[in-house]
Amino acid sequence: MKLQEKNPDVFKNDQSRRLSNEYLAKFCRDVPVESSESIRADSELLPHTDDVYRASGLNELAQTDPELAVQLALDLISRSKSGGAIEMAMDFLHQKNVNVGLGHENFSGGDAHRSLLRAQEIAAQMVSCDYSRLCGPDSLRAWVECVQPGVCQPGVSMQLIWQRSNSPQIYEAAVAIANQLRAMRRQP
């Protein structure tokens, strides 16, 4: 029996990886060095870079004041306009096993906690994508992240990756949690 007959996904992932490599090579070739340097310089002037700095220090802060670190992480999730800060804050809360109080109603049973954490992680990414242009069709983030689940194809987006690499229950819960986060963020 051939390897392809045993596991056809191996070859699907190879094709996905090849498509991703082709896209990334073209992307990197088409971006002038000056452009990426000016983007980096401009990003340092953006007001939300403080949030990224604060989010990157959550683990250090937790060593001296764990309650303040958790409060800061929750604040970043509910108020920051930095996608990176939102994702880092959610990751921190998960590392510390902090209950963020979103999505529990969507899961029960033995795998409930792990599924809930995954749905919350995806929800944070969805909200993060609201503040960047990195998640749409043919975006750099999508082409980088599509390799692992093997879904690289022209027009790939984070939405497609989330749908295809998670169970319908996790994906639907993530959408619901992301909507809860968005509603929470709209409140003054």
Model-assigned labels for residue ranges:
Residues 1-101, 131-142:
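Short helix-capping/linker turns of helical repeat alpha-solenoids
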Residues 7-8, 65, 97, 128, ...:
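Short, flexible coil/linker elements and helix-boundary hinge sites characteristic
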Residues 134-188:
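Terminal, low-structured helical/coil segments at or just beyond the last alpha-helical repeat
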Residues 87, 96, 118, 187-188:
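Exposed acidic/polar residues on beta-strands and adjacent loops within beta-sheet cores, strongest
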Residues 95-156:
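Mature extracytoplasmic/lumenal regions of exported proteins
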